[in-house]
Amino acid sequence: MQSLGRHVLAEIYGCRFEVLNDVKKVEDIMVNAALEAGAEIREFVFHKFSPQGVSGVVVISESHLAIHTWPELGYAALDVFTCGDRVNPWDACNYVAEMFSAGDMKASEVKRGLMEQPEERLVANM
């Protein structure tokens, strides 16, 4: 079965407070993560919460990267969804974890838009 895209959900632990709480640093890291993965950036928006935390999204031609940080816990939730075969979402995840000086990253990949091939559909419907 063919998929339309790859969606990596990453739990990033042991990150530096000062990075996770700096909206400009998080924005720069996420934009560079998209570029490192070979994506084409369309636009991005990031928000700094009070007293701490950052959320943001980078819209790419191939889909998106999204992040939510909990600096007080040294934790970030990262979401990287890419369509097609040109961009590797794992490259973006690994880049972010490295730039956050993460102690650990646990991640899983989900295939999105699983599509049956026409010949598979015909056989399945008989």
Swiss-Prot record:
GO biological process, one term: spermidine biosynthetic process
Gene Ontology molecular function: any one: adenosylmethionine decarboxylase activity
Record carries keyword Lyase: yes
Pyruvic acid (Ser) modification, residue list: 63
Keywords recorded for this protein, A-Z: Autocatalytic cleavage, Decarboxylase, Lyase, Polyamine biosynthesis, Pyruvate, S-adenosyl-L-methionine, Schiff base, Spermidine biosynthesis, Zymogen
Active site per the UniProt annotation: 63, 68, 83
UniProt site (Cleavage (non-hydrolytic)): 62-63
Superkingdom of origin: Bacteria
PANTHER family in the record: S-ADENOSYLMETHIONINE DECARBOXYLASE PROENZYME
Assembly with partners or alone: Heterotetramer of two alpha and two beta chains arranged as a dimer of alpha/beta heterodimers.
Name of the protein: S-adenosylmethionine decarboxylase proenzyme
Lineage, broadest ranks: Bacteria, Bacillati, Bacillota, Clostridia, Eubacteriales
Gene name tied to this protein: speH
